[in-house]
Design a protein with these regions (language model features):
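Short solvent-exposed coil/turn linkers within tandem alpha-helical repeat scaffolds
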Residues: 58-64, 93-100, 129-139
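Acidic, proline-/serine-/threonine-rich low-complexity intrinsically disordered segments
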Residues: 1-35, 39-42, 58
Length: 150
């Protein structure tokens, strides 16, 4: 899974990418994104949720929008609001060429497992195995399926 500290370091050292016109500049989007990740890292999940939500709504075509959506879902997951996390992780798949799809898929399985819906958790883990065979989470999904089938 993505390490939020590594992500902040990478972003701070990267040049801003061009994005479609929005109410904030790509530089401001990136700054707000880093601020939201910092809130997440510091356990200020409500602030992170607010900022990540605004980012996704402000410019869903920004290069960091899929990451914003993923971390929004991650906030809800960390707060143990699994039902909302499922809804937010599912939205990650609506972003073309996202690099967060396998992360989100794994987390969907974790959400259902945490809610006690073992059948659905197995389905979500199996989906990761089927659709993301090259994922770094492939073995983790297989292991989760094995554990839940006992």
């Amino acid at each position: 899974m993505t390490n939020s500290f590594t992500e902040i370091y990478t972003l701070k050292n990267a040049k801003p990418s061009k994005s479609s016109p929005s109410s904030i500049s790509p530089e401001q989007y990136k700054k707000n994104y880093i601020d939201a990740l910092s809130f997440y890292q510091n356990g200020e999940y409500d602030k992170a949720v607010t900022l990540f939500s605004k980012l996704v709504q402000t410019d869903s075509s920004n290069d960091l929008a899929d990451n914003s959506q993923y971390w929004l879902a991650e906030c809800y997951y960390t707060m143990k609001n699994y039902k909302r996390a499922v809804s937010e992780f599912t939205k990650v798949f609506s972003f073309p060429a996202t690099d967060k799809d396998d992360d989100a898929q794994l987390k969907l399985g974790h959400c259902y497992r945490s809610m006690g819906n073992i059948k659905k958790a197995i389905e979500e883990y199996q989906r990761l195995v089927d659709y993301f065979p090259g994922s770094e989470f492939y073995n983790k999904a297989l292991e989760s399926i094995k554990q839940l089938n006992i």
